[in-house]
A protein has these predicted regions:
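DNA major-groove recognition helix of helix-turn-helix/homeodomain DNA-binding modules
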Residues: 35-55
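A short, Lys/Arg-rich alpha-helix, primarily the initiator
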Residues: 1-5, 43
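ADP-ribose/NAD+-binding catalytic cleft of ART/PARP-like enzymes
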Residues: 52-98, 117, 270-279, 283-284
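Active-site and NAD+-binding cores of ADP-ribose-processing enzymes
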Residues: 132-286
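ADP-ribosyltransferase catalytic core
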Residues: 74, 91-101, 107-169
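Short alpha-helical DNA-recognition segment
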Residues: 7-25
Length: 286
């Protein structure tokens, strides 16, 4: 794909990478895989030639996704795993994730890719889930989403037992599947700033609106996990992961910039997270 993008012959491509024609031929025929050193050289070469490797990865995933035929009641999603899925799917992520322990899937392949780019044994999956057969809730992209994330990340424990706390505990109780906005690399920085008191709820809500986030589907029960089908596994090369790391870093930098802009625009509007909790503790917020 890289060679075709540059309209080079195998000989020309080999010369650029300082390898033999036979080596390039073996790579392209699938008889050998470039080692890390060769892929690192390719990374520098692709950067120099402005080759959109990350976009090529997304295109490959899109083509594989389009080839999958699903029953009408199933939704196509993406999942990134740090070490691959072995055995049955279970709701066993870290407890303090956005929506608690569960099997996390999303509508945005880019989000799943940037989450696993640092892990050598990571695997990327195209999956599907049947929503209609599950007890599920879809949380709108508003303050309820942020507070539900706060609850599941353990940020609301100081008001445990209040009606406000119980509202969010009950919201996802006895559910198989939770659907809500995804805290991508940019939004992650904004919501963390909300929790530590650097931005108000108004700033957060406007960020949710401005970023047009994808959705995450989280199977939080075994029944929910049993409804998930793995449709395809997509191999990721070391070269592709290097480009994913770069994209993740760019997204985080944009998140910092966005949070700073929002801080300026909504400095005096809305309430800070601690103020919301204090009001809930005193019985003012239900």
């Amino acid at each position: 794909q890289i060679r075709a993008h540059l309209n080079m012959s195998q000989t020309e491509f080999a010369e650029q990478l300082n390898v033999t024609f036979q080596t390039v031929n073996r790579w392209e025929n699938g008889r050998a895989v470039p080692n890390k050193l060769a892929q690192s050289k390719m990374f520098d070469f692709c950067k120099e030639k402005h080759i959109p490797v990350y976009d090529m990865t997304l295109k490959r995933i899109a083509e594989e996704s389009e080839a999958i035929k699903l029953d009408t009641d199933r939704v196509l999603l993406y999942h990134g795993s740090k070490s691959g899925i072995e055995g049955p799917i279970e709701p066993k992520s870290r407890k303090q994730c956005d929506f608690g322990k569960g099997f996390y899937m999303g509508t945005d392949p880019g989000q799943a890719l940037t989450l696993i780019c640092d892990y050598e044994k990571s695997k990327f999956y195209i999956v599907s889930v049947s929503v209609d057969k599950l007890a599920h809730i879809e949380v709108p992209a508003d303050i309820d989403w942020a507070m539900l994330v706060a609850y599941h990340r353990g940020k609301m424990e100081k008001i445990n037992g209040t009606p406000f706390y119980n509202k969010y505990r009950a919201m996802t109780l006895n559910k198989d599947l939770i659907i809500g906005s995804i805290a991508n690399d940019r939004m992650f920085f904004v919501i963390d700033n909300f929790f530590v008191g650097n931005v108000t709820d108004m700033a957060l809500i406007n960020s949710l609106s401005a970023l047009q986030l994808g959705k995450q589907y989280v199977a939080v029960s075994q029944k929910g996990c049993d409804s998930v089908h793995i449709e395809a596994e997509v191999e990721l090369s070391y070269l592709e992961r290097l480009f994913m790391k770069e994209v993740a870093e760019e997204n985080r930098a944009r998140g910092i910039s966005l949070a700073n802009d929002i801080c300026k625009n909504y400095r005096r509007e809305g309430m800070f997270f601690d103020e919301i909790l204090d009001e809930a503790k005193s019985g003012g917020k239900q």
